[in-house]
Amino acid sequence: MATSAPELTDRLTWPGRPEALRMADLRGAPALLLFGCASSAWTRQRLDDMSRLLRRHGDKLQAAALIAPRFDAERDPRNLQQLQAEHALPFPLALDADWVAWQQFGIESWPTLLLLDAQGRERKRIVGAGPMAELAELVQALVAETPEVPARKKPAANGKRGLMPELPLSYPTALVVGTGKLYLADTGHHRILECDFNGRIVRQFGSGAYDYMDGGAGDAAFRRPQGLALQREALFVADTGNHALRRIDLLSGDVTTLCGNGEGPTQIGTATIDQPCGLQASASHLYVAMAGDNRICAYDLSRGALETVAGSGFFAINDGNGMFAAFAQPTGLALRQDVLYVCDAAGSAIRAVYLRDQRVQTLVGQGPYDFGNIDGPRSIARLQWPRAIALDPHDPLLWIADAGNDRLCTLRLGGGVVSGFSLPQRLHSPGGVACGNDALWIADTGAHALLRLDGRDGTLRHVPVGE
């Protein structure tokens, strides 16, 4: 027998809303109520699923999400602003900083989605990010059994502070440096930029629409692109929100899809394309950090085949060979000869994959729930939600965008230490780093900015992209 959902606690924070959402606001039509974490790839998949269902059913369906902090850094309500902008969410989000609502509703893991009927009664509880088709069928049945009601105002998104910032850049992430050019994933604006080293925009790839479309530079569309790799006249894009790998022909500007369909996670051969993030290109393969599937994959550029390199798919930090290893939401990659370095974001870890035998070794990190801000030998060093890495071209160093600690740090390869790198200004959840043209380029994601750290004199300057 369906029971009424409890009232929402007053201890929730609703950024940008004049007043808190109440359960009464979700009555009158079926509703989706999500419990998740902003850093969780599976939560983000459910948010996209909810948006698709709201567009499909219009006024006959409504939604809200209660977001709890997995990491200390996620206690900042501004994380919800980023979440709403990157996903173009049309419904309100609340921060459950002390997990009060989670306890109130008996939530045990993220994401958990409650399906409520028009009377506010819980009809179904779905744990995890399962197939969209299954969720769509359940929602369709719930909508079909609901009698027509007079038009009513649905709970709106979190207001202007929850919308895409009106700035030249919006939550930039991935970077790659070419000959005389810098390529940048302007993630919140759903586009890729080609710039000169002074920040002048030379070309834009993608219309900026939150969509999925191949075509010319101005017609193509992306959803939250978060990975880039350059190979001669081709720029590869990890189109995260579309679960797709895309290719930009730098001669014509045309955008095509290598694999994925823009709808959701898709099985392709022996691998699943599920929220691809980090990319690295070799002469023959495109390596992919598959954040939603906790695996490292390789796309054969000649055969057009996607294969798993390492990872069982389980959310964990386990070393081993190939499928016996486990990752925790990998988001960034760096490649040197036959070693692929992996930024394992949710595991707060840095890993190495030795491509000759697919052996995985943890360089920094102790487990998915062991994080902090500690420099020193690898055995004691701690990171918090690192999002990107880059290899120094001159020294055996790995640069790390330690997003959860708002800092830049280095790992000296070959058994060295983790060291925080002092900068004259604070970073804001940096989500991208790249080396090139005698500089380290930093995507200061939360500040909507691109920074350049000069490799010769150590000066840091703001790069005025599009300004």
Predicted segments with their positions:
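Gly/Pro-rich loop segments of beta-rich domains
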Residues: R152-T173, G199-R224, D254-C277, A305-Q329, ...
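Structural microenvironment flanking redox-active thiols in thiol-disulfide oxidoreductases
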Residues: S39, R44-E86
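Short active-site neighborhood of thiol/selenol oxidoreductases, capturing the structured segment around
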Residues: R22-R44
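A short, hydrophobic beta-strand/beta-hairpin element that forms part of a small beta-sheet core
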Residues: V100, P111-I126
